[in-house]
Regions:
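Bacterial N-terminal signal peptides
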Residues: 7-19
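Lipid interaction determinants
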Residues: 2, 18-144
Length: 144
């Protein structure tokens, strides 16, 4: 048991010595923007079939990109987390766990989860973060 605890302590100390990977978005012109450590509030998703999903209260639908690829989300009446990758402007978001409270009628939690899973390209427009969905099916807009 002592050896196992010493091994775990060694791993912990080694991980603390590594530099943290930041969530840095790189545009096509080479400009970089740090989008990590910010609570991004979902404003809406505009779909390419002229429909949209728009939460009444954006603060109930958020994402937080943390160091080392960790993702934290607020899904209306639930919370969750997972992993993300960001390479230039290419992005993937993967939810690995959520709480399971029953949200009230009219909740957009399931649509928000679906849209996050479909995100493939990230870019900035002013101070807003945009996520283009796969198959050019739509764009999510987030504000600080």
């Amino acid at each position: 048991m002592k050896i196992f605890c010493a091994y775990l302590l060694t791993l912990l100390l080694a991980s603390l010595a590594l530099p943290l990977q930041a969530a840095t978005l790189t545009s096509s012109d080479g400009k970089t923007t740090d989008i990590g450590g910010i609570i991004w509030k979902w404003q809406r998703t505009m779909y390419n079939n002229d429909t949209k999903s728009e939460p009444a209260d954006p603060s109930r639908y958020t994402i937080l990109l943390m160091p080392e690829g960790h993702l934290s989300v607020h899904l209306d009446c639930n919370a969750g987390g997972g992993r993300y990758t960001l390479d230039g402007s290419s992005v993937t978001l993967e939810l690995t766990h959520t709480t399971m409270a029953a949200c009230p009628p009219g909740s957009l939690a399931q649509q928000f989860i679906k849209d996050l899973a479909a995100a493939r390209i990230a870019f900035m427009g002013g101070s807003n973060l945009y996520l283009d969905l796969m198959y050019d099916s739509g764009t999510m807009k987030f504000a600080r």
